[in-house]
Structure formats: structure tokens, C-alpha cells
């Protein structure tokens, strides 16, 4: 229904999806129909993509895969007019696969708070940056690596998201994982985070 609703808005419709796999025939059929009616569709899919875009000449469809050191499992679905004419956001466990949609118990949760929606917009914005390393599905249905030749932290979407989230929490007064010791973290819960961040950023996010 959400895809069909965007389709009714034609060229004003917009759909953004971040998932691991896009396989379900029914969902793909709906997306293709929406694309042919002018809906702008952005698909960030880490793994399997069964949708072909070679037959969608002139359609506003972008498909990319963004990989990194972490095996991501987050799903984000955004529909420009899905909430009484305003953007609707969902996060959850389900990929657009028949096994997820028809054979399993999965959860999709609507995101209502403006702050949380802004977080999702930020993540999607980073994933669609032009200066990150990614693979893109071309109109001839082949995957092409694009972005900087060298895969460095600066051009790693996952690293950029981690850095942004860490800096945001620090700016709001959260305890810095770089400063933890036995006195500030007696339970030891933050020490693994400190070790991970040190490996990624060096001794600190500005190192």
C-alpha cells in the first residue's frame, strides 16, 4: 500500500529503502510499476538484488550496495507521502524477501519522533554520498565499483556513520569511551567500545 500510495503521487513520489536483500517478486513488481510512473526510488541493498533496471529507461531508480568491515542488519524504509501526506519512516527486521514477508515473524516499526527521523535521514544521506566507496547497478544490469580508488576511513560509509554518531553523543554530554578507566567505568562495559574505536580512529576521533 505504501508503494502504491507513492505511485499515485507520480513524479512527486519518493521511496528510499535500505536493506540486505531485495528478492520478493511482488515487491519488485510494485517498485517497477512505481518507477514507470515517475516515482523516484533509491535502493541501498547490501546483498542480493533481483530487480532489473535495464528495462526502466528514463526511470528515476538508483540501486547501490555499500559494504564495510561490519555485517549490517539494519533496515530503513522511507516513503515521502506515507504518513497522511507526510514522510513515513520504518525500521525493522524484514528484508524484501518472500521468506521474510510470508514465512517468518518479522517486525517493522514506524518511527514518529522528529529526532529519530533526522537520524535516519542522516544515515541515508551518508549512504548516498558521492564520495564513498560503493557498487552501483548500471542500466545494463551490471554492478560497477564507484567512488575513490582507495578504501580509506574517509570514504567508508560505516566509519563515517560511526564517527558522526560518536561525536553527536559526546556533544550532548555522553561519557567518552576514550576516557574510560576503572574509576569511570567500574563495570567494564565501555572498554570494548574504547578498544574498537581506537582501532578505527586511532587514539581518538580526531587523531
Model-derived features with residue positions:
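PLD/PLD-like phosphodiesterase catalytic module centered on the HKD motif
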Residues: 1-207
Amino acid at each position: 500500500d505504501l508503494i502504491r500510495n507513492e505511485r499515485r503521487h507520480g513524479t512527486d513520489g519518493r521511496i528510499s529503502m535500505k536493506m540486505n536483500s531485495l528478492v520478493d517478486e511482488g515487491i519488485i513488481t510494485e517498485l517497477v510499476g512505481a518507477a514507470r510512473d515517475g516515482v523516484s526510488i533509491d535502493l541501498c541493498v547490501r546483498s542480493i538484488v533481483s530487480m532489473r533496471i535495464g528495462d526502466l529507461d528514463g526511470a528515476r531508480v538508483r540501486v547501490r550496495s555499500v559494504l564495510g568491515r561490519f555485517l549490517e542488519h539494519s533496515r530503513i524504509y522511507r516513503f515521502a507521502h506515507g504518513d497522511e501526506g507526510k514522510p513515513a519512516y520504518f525500521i525493522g527486521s524484514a528484508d524484501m524477501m518472500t521468506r521474510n514477508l510470508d514465512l517468518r515473524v518479522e517486525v517493522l516499526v514506524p518511527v514518529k519522533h522528529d529526532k529519530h527521523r533526522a537520524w535516519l535521514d542522516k544515515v541515508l544521506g551518508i549512504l548516498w554520498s558521492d564520495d564513498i566507496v560503493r557498487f552501483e547497478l548500471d542500466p545494463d544490469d551490471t554492478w560497477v565499483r564507484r567512488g575513490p580508488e582507495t578504501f580509506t576511513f574517509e570514504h567508508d560509509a560505516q566509519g563515517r556513520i560511526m564517527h558522526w554518531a560518536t561525536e553527536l553523543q559526546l556533544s550532548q554530554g555522553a561519557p567518552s569511551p576514550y576516557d574510560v578507566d576503572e574509576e569511570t567505568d567500574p563495570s567494564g562495559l565501555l572498554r570494548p567500545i574504547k578498544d574498537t574505536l581506537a582501532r578505527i580512529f586511532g587514539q581518538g576521533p580526531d587523531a
